[in-house]
């Protein structure tokens, strides 16, 4: 399993990828999952801080050479990681 996790404004964000599907988790809860494909975009809105909401995206790009995971909050990249398949 491939995982990218970060702490952002009081929320624990995580993108996971295994042989069957990809998942976006926020504070340990699966917010969206999707079957595998070359490019996946998983998203959810989360409350961070008091009455502040963020649009969170997990973007996963897969090809024969590399698996790239990116976490984005309100269109700003907050974490990135590459893996060799």
Report the location of each language-model feature.
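Cysteine-centric segments in proteins
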Residues: 1-85
């Amino acid at each position: 399993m491939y995982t990218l996790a970060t702490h952002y404004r009081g929320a624990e964000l995580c993108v996971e990828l295994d042989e069957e599907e990809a998942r976006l988790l926020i504070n340990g809860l699966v917010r969206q999952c999707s079957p595998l494909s070359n490019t996946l975009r998983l998203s959810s809105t989360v409350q961070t801080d008091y009455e502040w909401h963020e649009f969170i995206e997990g973007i996963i790009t897969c090809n024969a050479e590399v698996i790239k995971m990116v976490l984005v909050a309100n269109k700003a990249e907050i974490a990135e990681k590459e893996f060799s398949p």
